[in-house]
Each structure stands twice: as structure tokens, then as C-alpha cells.
A protein has these predicted regions:
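Active-site environment of divalent metal-dependent phosphoester hydrolases
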Residues: 26-31, 59-60, 75-79, 108-112
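Phosphate/diphosphate-binding glycine-rich loops and adjacent basic-rich segments that engage nucleotide
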Residues: 66-71, 75, 81-85
Length: 133
């Protein structure tokens, strides 16, 4: 498609930049495309002290892991209630002491409502900005 062609043209202008992708269920391009785009594809990626994974369910709960995780997959959303029956939902960064879940960067995916705990921090994407909730 047109976007992938534009990306490949742009990528060829910056061949020394390193790009890594932790592949998820929406990353459906053939492996040959990622190779042509000079993108390193991983099932998970460890860059001390961080682990990058697609789905939090992929964490091995049986090990004592002190690393911090970044993931995607669930497309976190926060619901804010206003006066009366006003309800607004926003994609968000969902940050806990153990992990951060990144928002979906697409208007075509749904949102999974999160219920943050007191120690969690949420950053909602509102219009063209990011707001701490």
C-alpha cells in the first residue's frame, strides 16, 4: 500500500538508524518487508532494565523478575465521568510499578477500560496532547 511505500522511501534516507519491532497481532506484513525496511523483528526484547513484550500475559510469573515491562496489545482506555451522565473514553498510557501498557496508535482499534489502582499513573491522550489523570 501507499503508506508502506512512503515509509520504505523515508527509511532509505536514514539507513544508520536502528529500528526494532516487538511483533504483535496487528503486525501482519511479511517478514521480507521488515527485512527490506531494515527493521529488527523480535518476539520480545530486553534492554536492561526493561523488557518489551507484546502481551502482559507473556510474562513468566514463576520467576522473580525485577525488570520493568512495556507492552501493548490490550489498547488501554480510561473512562472519565462528568456531570450528569457524561462519559468520555480516551486511549491512555497505563503505568504501574511493574509495567506500562502503551496505547493503540490507531482510531480503528477498540479500547479496553482499565481500573487503575491508587499507586498507578494514567496519561490520557486528549485531542493533540497528553494529560495526567
Amino acid at each position: 500500500n501507499n503508506e508502506t511505500d512512503i515509509y520504505l522511501q523515508w527509511r532509505k534516507q536514514f539507513p544508520l538508524f536502528n529500528f526494532s519491532l516487538v511483533k504483535g497481532n496487528h503486525d501482519i506484513l511479511p517478514n521480507s518487508w521488515y527485512e527490506e525496511a531494515n527493521i529488527q523483528v523480535h518476539q520480545s526484547l530486553y534492554l536492561a532494565p526493561f523488557n518489551f513484550i507484546h502481551d502482559l500475559n507473556d510474562i513468566d510469573q514463576t520467576i522473580n523478575n525485577q525488570n520493568y515491562y512495556f507492552s501493548g496489545h490490550i489498547h488501554p482506555g480510561i473512562q472519565l465521568k462528568g456531570m450528569g451522565k457524561q462519559n468520555l473514553r480516551f486511549p491512555c498510557f497505563y503505568c504501574t510499578p511493574q509495567f506500562t501498557v502503551l496505547p493503540a496508535f490507531s482510531k480503528f482499534t477498540g479500547l479496553a477500560n482499565i481500573k487503575p489502582k491508587k499507586e498507578d499513573v494514567v496519561f490520557a491522550i486528549v485531542n493533540d496532547g497528553i494529560v495526567k489523570i
